[in-house]
Regions:
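Asparagine-centered polar/low-complexity signal
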Residues: 15-16, 56, 67, 189-191
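Short, polar loop motifs at secondary-structure junctions
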Residues: 78-86
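Intrinsic-disorder/low-complexity, polar/charged segments
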Residues: 61, 144-145, 197
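Catalytic core of the metallo-beta-lactamase
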Residues: 1-51, 86-165, 170, 176
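Accessory terminal helices/loops
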Residues: 153-218
Length: 218
């Protein structure tokens, strides 16, 4: 098996899509092929891969607006968390493992930013596609304190589940680099540094604009 991995800038709000594939099996999964689904499909084809799945990390429009066109071009099913607003053809539950040739894509439910969010984790390849759950140096926004509390629990779940050497590939290019590692995020991401208690985490969420200004962050 030869692992195929591509990060693709698709436009929108600095969105990333991804192509994951097994070259020997000739199959690929497209992750969040929004804004420019044609380009994402073509990248899979250029690698000699047939698209078997279209996976949404979550149901926000900026991650799903390419679904219809990607499905039209590939006839692949939409995969998302059960009950997702993305209305998946193939709904999954927490911990479902999607088989893609010899690749195993573990889908980890991480509600908070939105209830249907999942992280796509490939343990053998040391890769996690974190969508809007975890960015480089930041995390996804929340609309309510209840959602922020849920997000805190989900972040702890990821901290417990993903080892330090896992590469983090986010859904947007919001950080100082397009990818990171769990070790680097634990050491530098302000929100992960505030995971000592939920109160500390919530305080940073509330004061994030001030914190950014004081630290000169964008």
């Amino acid at each position: 098996m030869k692992f195929v991995f591509e990060q693709i800038r698709t436009g929108g709000d600095r969105n990333f899509a991804y192509v994951l594939g097994d070259r020997e099996a000739g199959v690929a999964a497209l992750i969040d092929p929004s804004y420019d689904p044609e380009a994402v499909v073509e990248r899979a084809k250029a690698q000699g891969l047939e698209t078997a799945y279209i996976v949404n990390t979550h149901g926000h429009e900026d991650h799903t607006n390419g679904n219809a066109q990607a499905k039209k071009l590939t006839d692949a099913p939409i995969v998302a968390f059960r009950g997702s607003v993305a209305k998946p053809d193939f709904p999954v539950d927490d911990g479902h493992v999607l088989q893609l040739g010899s690749l195993h894509l573990e889908l980890i439910h991480v509600p908070g930013h939105i209830d249907d969010h999942i992280v796509v984790y490939l343990e053998e390849q040391r890769v996690a596609l974190t969508g809007d759950h975890l960015f480089v140096g930041k995390i996804g926004g929340t609309q309510t304190e209840d959602a922020a509390r849920t997000q805190y629990v989900s972040l702890q779940k990821i901290l417990d589940r993903l080892p330090d050497d896992i590469t983090v590939w986010p859904g947007h290019d919001y950080g100082c680099r397009p990818s990171s590692t769990m070790a680097l995020e634990k050491a530098t991401n302000p929100f992960l540094l505030a995971m000592g208690s939920v109160d500390e985490f919530l305080a940073l969420k509330r004061d994030w604009a001030t914190f950014k200004a004081e630290k000169g962050l964008k």
